[in-house]
Design a protein with these regions (language model features):
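Short, conserved phosphate/pyrophosphate- and ester-handling motifs at nucleotide-, phospho-/glycolipid
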Residues: 255
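Active-site acidic Asp-centered loop
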Residues: 117-119
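N-terminal nucleotide-binding beta1-loop-alpha1 segment
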Residues: 1-32
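Short, acidic, metal-binding catalytic loop of nucleotide-sugar glycosyltransferases
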Residues: 53-60
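Conserved core of the sugar-phosphate nucleotidyltransferase
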Residues: 124-233, 244-248
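Short phosphate-binding loop-to-helix
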Residues: 78-113, 123-124
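Short catalytic helix/loop segments, enriched in acidic residues and glycine
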Residues: 31-49
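A conserved acidic beta->alpha catalytic loop
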Residues: 67-73
């Protein structure tokens, strides 16, 4: 990813999306937490796990948190303390993830590269973040998207049900990890346009990929590179895929089954290493 060559300029500002998408989020209902981001995983609120991970990564300079609502902060004293101390900059969330991301970006200097992730990434580790960003920095692109192979998830977590994008060159699972240079920020605006069409799926597919790419997908000929090239052409942003080796990168906590899996993975790691070190 093309950024200024000076090492200091290669530290990223992180934007974390932390708002509930619905008033009936299954994780919130199951755990009784004030919001999804506060739901405990391994006894620690998900949002605190993510913030701890970003703090431990030497490629992250600042953290901006979009949501949850300020009225809920008393329900997570550790988060409230970090906001009050200036460790984290909090912003009210907007009415959609893309608009929240856009608001977060507006508070970051244009010459600062950005990492975008989510508060429900409970298994995120400093090593995953570092690997993603280091790979992104070596690529000739404006935006990088993290992914793991469907096979890696199936092998590591048998029975785990994940949404896998199946293309000619394999199955892919997104990781909710995105990196942008200044030019790459335009991808968030493209994302917002796609969100506005979410109730019109075929028009959405046509706008995001284009007719030729859709035909290739239908006939099983679409590869990841062709898909990214189609999105790059439509958005005007040069996008590249960063394949990550750690299958935990593809596990976010959206459903109760995800929560149980994350708890099991954390328990397995603690038991095998005698430590909760997330590296």
């Amino acid at each position: 990813m093309s950024v200024e060559p000076h090492p200091a300029a290669q530290r990223f500002a992180a934007v974390v999306l932390a708002a509930d998408r619905t008033g009936k989020d299954p994780i919130t209902l199951h755990t009784g937490a004030a919001c999804k981001a506060f739901a405990p995983v391994g006894g620690v609120p998900m949002i605190i796990r993510v913030l701890d991970t970003l703090k431990a990564c030497n490629l992250i300079s600042t953290v901006i948190l979009c949501g949850p609502p300020e009225s809920l902060h008393d329900r997570c004293p550790e988060l409230k303390l970090r906001i009050a101390s200036g460790q984290v900059t909090w912003l009210p969330n907007m009415d959609s993830p893309s608009r929240s991301a856009d608001r977060g970006l507006s508070h970051i200097p244009l010459d600062t590269p950005v990492l975008l992730t989510t508060a429900d990434h409970a298994l995120l580790t400093p090593g995953i973040v570092r690997s993603f960003l280091q790979n992104a920095l070596t690529m000739q692109c404006d935006a990088a998207v993290g992914a793991v192979s469907g096979q890696a998830i199936a092998s590591s977590f048998p029975g785990c049900k994940r949404t896998i994008i199946r293309l000619r060159d394999g199955g892919f699972r997104g990781c909710n990890l995105y990196a942008f240079n200044p030019q790459g920020r335009a991808l968030v605006g493209f994302w917002r346009q796609a969100e506005d069409l979410r109730k019109r799926p075929w028009r959405l597919i046509g706008q995001v990929l284009g007719f030729n790419a859709v035909l290739l997908y239908v006939f099983g000929l679409l590869t990841s590179q062709r898909a990214l090239a189609a999105i790059s052409e439509k958005s005007g942003v040069n996008i590249q895929l960063v394949m990550l080796d750690d299958p935990r990168a593809g596990i976010d906590v959206d459903k109760v089954e995800d929560l149980m899996l994350a708890e099991a993975i954390l328990g397995r790691k603690t038991g095998s290493e005698g430590s909760t070190d997330p590296s």
